[in-house]
């Protein structure tokens, strides 16, 4: 975990835990193991603060042009980070080369090159076709938890992986922090929290299911 990052509601960032890990490490590990056994984290550990960051120079009067980032407590991120480190080593074998995001050794420019190659091939061989560009709106926030559990099962992840996901996301709450004001906390019922080390890997696994369905449909 990187230093000098904005902390969650606890106010303690990764720097604090790194300095005092010899004193706190045992308690952190014990707390996470207890959470797994009881299938429950304390309400404060799952709290997040949502702050919105503008997307480039796009008009800021539209909500869609803001990117919500959730500031999470460090203990929570230590737990999800451990699971993320275990999952990401498997992803290159599970995720098709068409997906180039979030995976080490893959470059998004390869997809741009692929589009040019397809255009050249169709023109050279006089093949009619169409390119459809689809963008997920609020992609991370729209994934249902039941679908995430089904996805983990479809890729034959151990039941403990799904249990960990449910431990971290069940009963999670967030509040919006903007312009010096803080909203009331509200319950989160879907999506992967941007700011969670695990979220990007969960998302590309879910997106891979869509890719598989497209590959299996020979009419596309």
Annotate the PLM regions:
Residues 1-3, 10-220:
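Nucleotidyl polymerases of mobile genetic elements and RNA viruses
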């Amino acid at each position: 975990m990187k230093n000098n990052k904005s902390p969650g509601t606890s106010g303690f960032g990764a720097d604090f835990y790194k300095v005092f890990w010899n004193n706190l490490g045992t308690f952190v590990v014990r707390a996470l193991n207890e959470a797994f056994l009881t299938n429950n984290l304390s309400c404060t550990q799952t709290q997040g603060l949502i702050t919105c960051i503008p997307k480039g120079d796009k008009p800021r009067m539209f909500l869609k042009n803001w990117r919500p980032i959730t500031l999470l407590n460090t203990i929570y991120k230590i737990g999800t980070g451990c699971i993320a480190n275990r999952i990401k080593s498997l992803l290159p074998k599970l995720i098709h080369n068409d997906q180039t995001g979030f995976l080490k050794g893959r470059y998004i420019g390869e997809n741009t090159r692929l589009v040019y190659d397809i255009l050249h091939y169709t023109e050279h061989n006089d093949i009619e076709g169409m390119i459809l560009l689809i963008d997920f709106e609020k992609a991370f926030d729209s994934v249902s938890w039941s679908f995430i559990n089904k996805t983990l099962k479809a890729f034959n992840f151990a039941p403990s992986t799904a249990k960990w996901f449910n431990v971290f996301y069940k009963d999670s709450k967030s509040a919006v922090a903007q312009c010096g004001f803080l909203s009331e906390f509200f319950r989160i019922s879907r999506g992967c929290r941007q700011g969670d080390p695990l979220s990007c890997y969960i998302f590309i696994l879910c997106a891979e299911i869509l890719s598989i369905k497209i590959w299996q449909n020979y009419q596309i």
